[in-house]
Amino acid sequence: MPEGALRNFTINFGPQHPAAHGVLRLVLELDGEVVERVDPHIGLLHRGTEKLIEQKTYLQAIPYFDRLDYVAPMNQEHAFCLAAEKLLGIAVPRRAQLIRVLYCEIGRILSHLLNVTTQAMDVGALTPPLWGFEEREKLMVFYERASGSRMHAAYFRIGGVHQDLPPQLIEDIETWCDAFPQVVDDLDRLLTGNRIFKQRNVDIGVVTLPQAWEWGFSGVMVRGSGAAWDLRKSQPYECYAEMDFDVPIGKNGDCYDRYLLRMEEMRQSVSIMKQCIAKLRAPDGQGPVALEDHKIVPPRRGEMKRSMEALIHHFKLYTEGFRVPAGEVYVAVEAPKGEFGVFLVSDGTNKPYKCKIRAPGFAHLQAMDFVTRGHLLADVSAILGSLDIVFGEVDR
């Protein structure tokens, strides 16, 4: 056979492939079954979120954050609210902080449950997704009972949360926390020692720690490579400094280590949720769930019926919104997928001048070519599952 007669084979992976996690299109260059090059094509879910936010008041911008990583919506609202609160220079009441942390941990479990079980499905196990979705359904009901909506909650507010949690809901969350570790143990027994699952994940998609820093990884992708970098510990925000929890880290930086980390993080999240519930019931956990300043937080309905001033505040807030002092601020939270950051620039008006969103999935997807090169075609879906990419936040 003459030189140069061998030609690499190019195939499209997605955007309608079941393992592509939404609307990802990968153009793969294959030499036989070995991946030579991966070219991710993004933008199929682009909605211009950052531009839309510039035309909305600060209150109207909150729902856009639910639609980024729509697997764990409240974690993103959290970053935006913290950024706006930093510009306004306000402190959130303690009860509101506890409720926020409680729901952020629920979001973390929602995300990790989906990721671990679909990663198992990508390599051929069909039972875990069914168990995972059963638990996610219960958590979405908690979202619904707090905010009225299962997914796009829009529950966090600048200055606190929308409304208090009923005592019965807190009890139900506690009951769920007692039962859930058993589900994690069941998944553990099914997958962790499973020969086929290990063959598909061990030593696949290895990322060393220096490489993880170079590519701008965060979250599980960095911790899987051996760095105990968790913003809840290294730069505590809200009341995370009071919480007692461990940051699990991996040794090998492969898909299997990242799976083990997500399993352990679910256990840690349950522990944080239990601590939040205990603190919410304590005497110092009682009190308002939002700021009492009616220039920022709307007054209660009952107050509006009695006081003309409250009615005027309400009208001004919902027509014009509140003005935020000019300045710029970057706030990052430890979202389930990694470091979710909001860079907010205010020009002193009632709308953000610029809101730049730093999505963790974007940095992870750009390294897809680097991580996948030299692996087999079958490993692409395992690596993709382990990067934990959601397209709402990548394309935004």
Swiss-Prot record:
It holds the Pfam family Complex1_49kDa. It is a peripheral membrane protein. InterPro entries: NADH_Q_OxRdtase_suD (IPR001135), NADH_UbQ_OxRdtase_49kDa_CS (IPR014029), NDH1_su_D/H (IPR022885), NiFe-Hase_large (IPR029014). NDH-1 is composed of 14 different subunits. Subunits NuoB, C, D, E, F, and G constitute the peripheral sector of the complex. NDH-1 shuttles electrons from NADH, via FMN and iron-sulfur (Fe-S) centers, to quinones in the respiratory chain. The immediate electron acceptor for the enzyme in this species is believed to be ubiquinone. Couples the redox reaction to proton translocation (for every two electrons transferred, four hydrogen ions are translocated across the cytoplasmic membrane), and thus conserves the redox energy in a proton gradient. NCBIfam families: NuoD, PRK06075.1. This is NADH-quinone oxidoreductase subunit D. The lineage of its organism: Bacteria, Pseudomonadati, Pseudomonadota, Alphaproteobacteria, Hyphomicrobiales.
